[in-house]
Every structure is written in structure tokens, then in C-alpha cells.
Amino acid sequence: MWAMGNEAAAMPDLLRLLNAKNPLPSVSVQPLPWTAAHEKLLTGFAGGALPTLSQVGNSWIAELAAIGAIEPVPEAQAVLLTDQFDAVIDTCRIGNKIWAVPWYVDTRVQFYRRDLFAKTGYDAPPPRWDDWKAALHKVKRAVGEGNYAILMPVNEYEHLTTLALSAKAGMINDEGTRGAFSEPAFVDALAFYKSLFDEGLAPLASATQISNVWNEFARGYFSVYPSGPWTIGDMQTRLPKEFQDKWGTAPNPGPDGPGSAAPGGSSLVVFRGAANAEAAWGVVGALLGAQGQEILQKLTGNLPARKSAWSSNVAASDGYIAAFASQLHTARALPKVPEWERIVSEMQIVAERMLRGQFTVKEAAAEMDKRANRLLEKRRWMVGQGRSL
């Protein structure tokens, strides 16, 4: 088995604890750094050197399915796909087949300064875009000149995609062959994104220009920080004890009410032609069982993929987690084409240039479509030949 990051470090203890209850097949775990894992999977496939089982980033599933590296989840294992969040399962569904089993989940919510919102008359950030922006203006006035309301680094695409998903924008057409950035829903989201910078609510800065996110959050340089569940631990360890009652989490806003976000996390796949596939699915079943999900959450802090696990373990007792549970129920899958990571990188390059005055909103949307269409050229040919998933 190949595994990455914190999960790879936790696997020996996780497997040992699971084995104590119900013996599992012997599993040899090879840890991979996240930065090298995607390339390792592709070269492993090309060289016929893949393992039986692997953890994969959810955004890689479409590519691995397209090249024939992974097997669909067999009917006999369909029970592993029950009790899961719909949007996460949808991320694993390509061409009417499900190719991976979600292992743990994440998404992005707002980390906000509870004390500063209370000072301006809000218990939490409002759920509608217009009201939310009005609240940000009040918070910005309260923190004074030189400070902002929200941090949305211009080199990070997740902030724009969150707004786009909240506006129900597709970004890629239904066939996955052309960009849909010029569609009204995305243009509205892009215009709203731009307004946050134009109105001085967000600094025009990349992540590398913020020297210490935690210090800046504590001193009020920004009061809203959209991020994932890993930030809970960072807030608890990097902010002083006396500051712990001054921050909270809230779901994302949307145009007319609660917004959306992309479902993230990792899934487990079994590779095509693996000799020990049946045993591998047994391991997947153990990792997705109630005990496996609880142990993984305790060892890594990851949010369980199985919904029932949220009510039976520490995730249920953590008040900061509630916003993530709410957000996962309204999450929407990102486009599932192998080229998506390159497309979304180009999207953000254009978005940053728009913020710096090179494009209007409509010009930026058209440029995004142009770049997406160029990247999707091969896919259009494959669809025309009936060769895509």
C-alpha cells in the first residue's frame, strides 16, 4: 500500500490496532510525500510498478480512471459506498462508475474572529453574500486603517472555486469538453470575488506575502480566513490560550443563502490487475469500518468519510467541527476531467491578472474559457471517438 503525509505516518499504529480486533492480511506500507505522490502514481503505472492498494487525492481519480490504472469499486464492495456524503461519492463517480472509496473528507469553511464580529453586532458571518459583505465592511471599519476583513491569497484558486460552487457554476460543460467560465453563474461569482478586492475587504497579496498567518489573524489584520479542518489544530496550538474563545468556524455564504464548497480528502483505490485485489478490498473494508474511522480520526485529526462516524467519535464533540459537517452536506463536486488541475491553475492565473487590472470580469471569463478549451482539445477528440469515460 502507498500512503501519504500524516496518514502514512499513522498507518502502522492504525493497522496494529485494527489487527488486535480482527486479523488483517499483512500490509506493507510505503510512505510517499504529497509533493511527489501524483508523479509516482503515473510513473508506477507506466512502469508496471504499482502496489495493490493506495491512498489517492480525490482530484486524481478521474486521471487514474482515464488511463486505466484503477478498477471500479466491485459490486461486492458496494456497502463501502453507503453512509457517505453525496458530494464526496460524486467526486469518485466517473462515467457512471465509482472508482474509489472515500477514506476521509475535508472541505473549506470560514475561520473567523468571533470577538470582532460580536463587536459589530453579529453572532457569526451571515449566510447571504450581500449581508456577508456588509458585515465584512463593518468589521473592516472596526479594525481600522491598514487592516482587512478577509484573507484570500491571490495565488490560491480555492477561494474562487468556493464562490463559483456556491453560485452553482459548472466551470466545465456537462460533456467535460469545453470551459463554461463565461456562463452567467460563474461570471456573477467572478464579479463578486473581484468586488472583495476592489472594495478593500481583502488584501491583494499571495500566501507568501503573509509572513505569519496566525499572528496576523490574532492582531486583526484580517478577521476571516477560509481554510480546511487542519487549521483547527493550528489555531489551537499557534494562538495563545487567552485567545481561544475569540475565534470560531462558520459555513460559507452563498448568493441567496448558505453556500457550498468542494469536497476534499483522500480515497482508497485498488489497481487494475492487482493479484491480491480481494485481500486489498478486505483491508479497505476494515479502514472504512467504525473502528477504523474512529482510530484514523484520533491519530490524524482527519474527518471521517462515513457519516455515522461523526456521531460516535470525537468529531461529534468538537464544536469547531460542526461547520464542516454542515458544509459537507451542501458540498458540490468539482469538474471531473483529468485536465482539471491544470485548468484551475490557469483559471487562477487569469483571475489574479484581472484583480491587477489586466482584464475586466467578462474578458477574464473569456480568457479562462480559451485556456480551458486549449487544455481540453485532446479530450474533445477522444469524446468524438467514443474513447473517453
Task: Mark where each language-model region is.
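Short, well-ordered beta-strand elements
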Residues: 1-6, 25-30, 52-53, 99, ...
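Extracytoplasmic/periplasmic solute-binding protein
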Residues: 99-103, 108, 133-179, 222
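Extracytoplasmic "Venus flytrap"/periplasmic binding protein-like
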Residues: 16-86, 91-93, 118-127, 216, ...
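Extracytoplasmic "Venus flytrap"
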Residues: 1-14, 32, 158, 334-339
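Glycine-centered hinge/linker elements that transmit conformational signals in sensory
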Residues: 136-138, 178-206
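Hinge/lid segment of periplasmic solute-binding proteins
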Residues: 58-109, 133, 161, 244-253, ...
